[in-house]
Swiss-Prot record:
This is Holliday junction branch migration complex subunit RuvB. It comes from Prochlorococcus marinus (strain MIT 9515). Residues 276-352 are annotated as: Head domain (RuvB-H). Belongs to the RuvB family. Homohexamer. Forms an RuvA(8)-RuvB(12)-Holliday junction (HJ) complex. HJ DNA is sandwiched between 2 RuvA tetramers; dsDNA enters through RuvA and exits via RuvB. An RuvB hexamer assembles on each DNA strand where it exits the tetramer. Each RuvB hexamer is contacted by two RuvA subunits (via domain III) on 2 adjacent RuvB subunits; this complex drives branch migration. In the full resolvosome a probable DNA-RuvA(4)-RuvB(12)-RuvC(2) complex forms which resolves the HJ. The gene is ruvB. One of its GO terms (cellular component) is Holliday junction resolvase complex. Its EC number is 3.6.4.-. GO terms for biological process: DNA recombination; DNA repair.
Amino acid sequence: MAIISSSLDESNIPRSRKELRLVDSKIIADEKINKNLNIVRPTSFKEFIGQEQIKSSLKIAIDASKYRKEALEHTLLYGQPGLGKTTLALLISYEMNSKCRVASAPSIERPRDIVGLLLGLKEGEILFIDEIHRLNKLTEELLYSAMEDFRLDLTMGANRGARCRTINLPKFTLIGATTKLASISAPLRDRFGLCHKIEFYSNDELKQIIFNFSNLINLQLDSDACCSLAKISRGTPRIALRLLKRVRDYAQVMKKTNKISIEIIEKALDSQKIDNRGLDNVDRKFLSFLKLNNNNPIGLDSIAAGMGEESSMLEFVVEPYLIQIGFIMRTPRGRKLTSLGKKYISSNNEKY
C-alpha cells in the first residue's frame, strides 16, 4: 500500500503571529513537516482510539466490498479540524490494501487538475480530497459522472469544432473530508454512499492518545498528568498533542527532565496563558467583550470589530468550544454570556 501526496495546501496555515494559538485545532506550519505527527498515526482501526461507531460502520462496508471484490463506496467524512478525518481516510486505504492519492481541494484550481488525478487512478485505488467543500464549480461538475458512472465527459475544441469525448475510468473510491458540510452542494453530497460525522473525543480517549504519544517521544507521564492534559484539550487530539509538546519543551528546558507532573503541566501552560479550562487570551478577550456590554446580546460583526479579529475566525474557531462548555449562547439578537461564563470571566480576569 502506498500513499501519494499532492502539493500541500498552504491556505489553511495561519500566517500572522496572533493566529498561532496552541488551542486552535487548525494545523500550523511546523506541523506540516513534523515527523512526530506521522509517527503517532495508527496503521489499523484497532490502533485508532475513539470513534467506535464510525469504525464499526466502515469496517462492515470495507469487508463487504472485499467480499464482493468491488471498490468501496465513495465516503464523506466531516467534522471540526484536528479530529482525525485524514487519519481515517488513510486507514481506509490500509484496510482496503489500496494505494491512496492525497490532494487538497484548493490546489485543484483547474478542471484539468482533477482530470489528471482521475486518469492516474487504477482499479480499486482511493482518491482523498481534503477540504472538498472548496472545489470550484467546474471541477465539482466533472466529479458527478466520475463518481456515479466512472466516466469523464469532456468537451474538446470550441465553437463549431467542439466535440464531446467520453473516457471510461477504473472503479475507484473518492473520500472527501470537510469542516463545512453545508458548503458542499447537494448534487455532490448525494453521490457519497457513506457519510460520517467525526465527533469530539472523550477525556478517557484523549488520555490514552496522550499516553501513547508520550511513550513515542520518550516522556514519562503518570495517569493524573495525562488526565489533566486531556481535560484542557477541547476534545481534539491535535490540540492534545500540540499542548503535550509545549509541556515537553518546558520540562526539558526549565526542569531538565522528561518526567511530566501535574505541577509542570500547570506551569508550562501558565507560561502560554492557557488556563485549567483550556482557554487562552483570545477566548478570555471574547468573554470579556461580552461582559463589558452588560451582557446585552452583541452581533458577531460587532464583536469582531471590537477585538480586531475576523468574524469567520470567531464563529468557526473560538465560539464552538465556548458554546460546548456552556460559557456563551447564541440568540436571535446576538451572543451573550451564560451564568457560567460570567462566573468564569469574573474570577479569571485578575489572574491574566
